[in-house]
């Protein structure tokens, strides 16, 4: 699961590089590949400096980005939507509904690794209930509102998915460059967070198995540098087929992250009921051990349960063809949870 987390962070880092390619080119006269490389390099520098810078930048960019998106929403909604866009009498389309639910589930459950990684930095007096609701509502509102805005912008711009920065900046006239800078900095922040998270996942694998208590800056530089390099190469390789690439990684999250989320939820709420020996989680010889064979088998069965429902650009399963969309998150959530309990 940690390896899957690592891969997911790398793939999203690559996706951000592609999305910001044209935004970088609007400031600097460079080619496509160079723009992606520059974006990856700056992301690496911020990520390497560390958590404190990422956290402070995130707080600032949350406020600035929120204002930018609010202004864009107000201006965009002043334009008429396409005829029939809000017509609820078109009939119910199961395929469209199932696809929307799957993508929403993938995005929401994919937020889990961020919560797990960074909730550990919270003060001890912050309750689990507070952590849950602030994380959930932040994810729901942050993603949901921006997705709704993206749907509106998609009716106005043909290239909004591949070049959202220019679409957003176009609303600000002579201030478009300022708006573009804010958009780029906002994506830089989450990109550096992705790289930092990938580094943490990679180091947790080795430190957990070897009982390491400290990671040197040299090791951090190498691990994060290799991660940034991998993400940049993937971005360069997929930049001209981005929509299929991003759709695949969004759906693929379901196959690998949801079964493990199901195991964690079942363990926390139904088996352990929130009672853990935290110190032993950091000890390879503790009561939890290095790994649990039966749990890993359950996880793999959970992954296997998604195969008959998979729907990707290169593979369409039987049930995906029948339903018209991927609903693999349902067995991915139910099967491992039932087996674990």
Regions found by a protein language model. Name each.
Residues 1, 16-34, 123, 194-225, ...:
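Helix-loop-helix connectors at the membrane interface of multi-pass transporters/channels
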Residues 22-36, 52-61, 164-179, 185, ...:
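Transmembrane helix-loop boundary segments of multi-pass membrane transporters
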Residues 34, 38-39, 43-76, 91-92, ...:
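Membrane-interface loop-to-helix entry segments
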Residues 221, 260-337:
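C-terminal membrane-solvent junction of multi-pass transporters and transport-like membrane proteins
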Residues 30, 64-89, 104-109, 149-156, ...:
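Hydrophobic alpha-helical segments and their helix-loop junctions in multi-pass secondary transporters
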Residues 2-3, 27-49, 63-74, 104-115, ...:
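Transmembrane alpha-helical segments of multi-pass small-molecule transport proteins
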Residues 192, 205-240, 287-307:
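Loop-to-transmembrane helix boundary motifs in multi-pass membrane proteins
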Residues 73-79, 89-153, 175-195, 288-306:
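Hydrophobic, membrane-embedded alpha-helices of multi-pass small-molecule transporters
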